[in-house]
Amino acid sequence: MEPRLSFVTLGVSDLQRATKFYEEVLGLPRISTPPEVTFFELGKTWLALYPRELLAADAGVPAAGSGFPGFTLAHNVRSAAEVDALLKEVAAKGGRIVKSGTRADWGGHTGYFADPDGFLWEVAWNPQFPHT
C-alpha cells in the first residue's frame, strides 16, 4: 500500500448541519457533490461527510455508537499563537471548545474543538513537525 490517505469520512447525524459547520465555521472549500454526501478538498486529502446510518451500512456495522469515536483529527499550524487564534475563531463562530490551547508535554501547544457530531479536532503547533 502506498503511504497515502485519500479520504477521511465522518458519519454525521445531520448532513446539512455538518456541512454548514465545515463551510462556515472552519471555512473549508466545498466541492460540488451529489446531495447524499459532501466533500471538502484539503490539499491531497479529502474530507467526506456522509450520513452515519449510510456509512455504517456501507461498512456492515451497527450505526449506534458508544460516544467517543475512537479517533481524533488533527490540524497542525505554524505557531502557538495560531493554535489559540484558530480556537478563538471556532468559538466565535459557535464551535465548541473541548480543551483550550495549552503547552503540551512534548514541547508544542495544543487544543481541541468538537464539530456538531462530537468529532474531535486537535489544533496543534509542534516545533519538531516540519509538515505544517
Tell me the role of every PLM-derived stretch.
Residues 1, 87-132:
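Vicinal oxygen chelate
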Residues 42-44, 66-70:
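Short connector loops at helix/strand junctions that flank enzyme active sites
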Residues 57-63:
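Short beta-strand/turn micro-motifs at beta-sheet edges
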Residues 9-56:
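Core segments of cupin and vicinal oxygen chelate
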Residues 1-17, 70-75, 127-132:
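N-terminal beta-strand motif that seeds the catalytic metal site of vicinal oxygen chelate
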Residues 72-88, 94-96:
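Mid-chain, well-packed structural core segment of small domains
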Residues 35-37, 70, 108:
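Short hydrophobic/aromatic beta-strand or adjacent loop that forms the aromatic wall/cage
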